[in-house]
């Protein structure tokens, strides 16, 4: 420091003194009678510096760096007579040294602290107090106790069952290559799921009436649902649900594509007509929502978009949605739905992989308990959310009324009449034709949805449509693994 001035000031007593380095001879030790300040006159040589004054602070130190910056702009002013640091840094020369550093900070306005995450969340369309509710129960007893503590004395169950064509091959691994709707003395995955959920929620259902609907068959496709009984009457207990299911399955024609929007909208109609009673919609399905090969990455297919919109709309009602996945999957998109659907009043959607739980090496009773727990563990906080959001016990007034189609069966039921809800007479959107589709037309249609033309071929030579083909892992005709997909037109 100051090396360029040492030659001009060679007449000073000591070329290594502080004054010679600063080119200020008047600050030398012989220019004044004041004793040199003990803290700002240390020589830069290895000689030990004078003892510091008691209790020095970093701001009151007067080393060489300080003196060059502090006094370079004031060469004609003598130093003050004493340099003892003041007790406060604000009154010392340390404050003068750091004045440049603090000047900009002092001139800045006093901004408030940045908003917290909770404040940012308030700007969004849903309350994150009810978003991504943690899985914090470990037994069915805890679930029952939590339901009671939350005041859930009455919970109404709604059941929706997937009758799409993919049920015929998505049991290749998990159901011994049989259709997931195969009927025998052993309950199929749909019957197992209905039984476990029905037994668990039976204690909370006062009237024991269960609205049941099917979707994805040849009469509904991805547009409508059909009621298990004519005129939309409900089933009396889950035992009747199982019995009626066995009556319907042999007479159905599985089709597609898959969309959960119609069954969610039907459940919304049921909740609205009940004047806002709390309901749990259990959707049992073998696959996720149809996604066309033409759908760009990062975008949703029409079926996916309608399903997301329906889930968001359902969060304005006291309605929880539990999707039970049966069969081989895949279920990656359903996990995305469970975790990341935005813009909801509360977290109203829960996905449970039935196959994964029931394939564990455990006793059957323990697997059933684990499944019921996984399906219902989020019901208590979701029920609390409907109370705090003032959704319970009131009509929304802005819910479109969906009318279910009649069951696609010819025979009536032997069960006595239960309750007939106040639905308008159902009018099917598609005219029924008395004659069967010709075999020539059948050959040209996709064997999965039975509605779209065949426009995608696999390596084995068999064909489907471009909406159904991307979701397949094995050919639905010959069961060969699909490694090549070719769009025909």
From Swiss-Prot:
Its EC number is 2.3.2.27. It is a lipid-anchor. It is found in: Cell membrane; Nucleus. Residues 34-57, 76-88 have a biased composition (Pro residues). It holds the Pfam family zf-C3HC4_3. GO terms for cellular component: nucleus; plasma membrane. It comes from the Eukaryota. Residues 1-10 have a biased composition (Basic and acidic residues). N-myristoylated. Disruption phenotype: No visible phenotype; due to the redundancy with RGLG2. Rglg1 and rglg2 double mutants show a complete loss of apical dominance. The double mutant seedlings rglg1 and rglg2 exhibit a dehydration-tolerant phenotype. E3 ubiquitin-protein ligase that mediates the formation of 'Lys-63'-linked ubiquitin chains. Regulates apical dominance by acting on the auxin transport proteins abundance. Together with RGLG5, mediates the ubiquitination and subsequent proteasomal degradation of the target protein PP2CA. Functions as a positive regulator of abscisic acid (ABA) signaling through ABA-dependent degradation of PP2CA, a major inhibitor of ABA signaling. Acts as a negative regulator of drought stress response. This is E3 ubiquitin-protein ligase RGLG1. It comes from Arabidopsis thaliana.
